[in-house]
């Protein structure tokens, strides 16, 4: 029977790769050099989930695990912590933040569990104010996702719109201010554009939609329609760069109103 490797085996493989007689590339990697790879593997895992590609999900989760073990080995070499410390830490965190399972607290609904989780998280991180909780949201997060998390922190203390219509009204207000900034400085335009995006995220939160996913779908839809435009042009013996804006717009409208299964 073919050997089935364990987590301990995998950690030993990484250790050998980074050892004295190991791989020249693996030996010189740092947290900073692996930063982009960590992000890429996380996004590729999410893509596998979105596509419901279970076989690829298994592979991508392995790639994420590679990053975890790699970073752990870097710190073990420095004498700071190792993989067992990471596992010990996350195990203790899960027990601490689930007192309704491992303790005597009561939480019967997912909402109550999340409320307890956030309260315990603030206590654990010694966050005495809601502002500190907001500032703790990672800067490395995609901006739309970070905006949503910050808005949820504000909601926890009651600082929020009452209805989605109020949130939409804010979008209209910010759009008007952006229009007015067009004759002002780039700095003012940037500020107003940021305010508009922040307001749009608020609407997505009320609709219980992920703004990142919504934008990703919009990008995919744009590419699909652009492909239809280009194919129509090629079938007519034309090049996009040689067409007028009016011609392109006509093709675009045709693509927009045609049934495209890839946009469903």
Give, region by region, the residue ranges found by the protein language model.
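Flexible "arm" and connector segments at domain edges
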Residues: 1-60, 66-193, 197-264
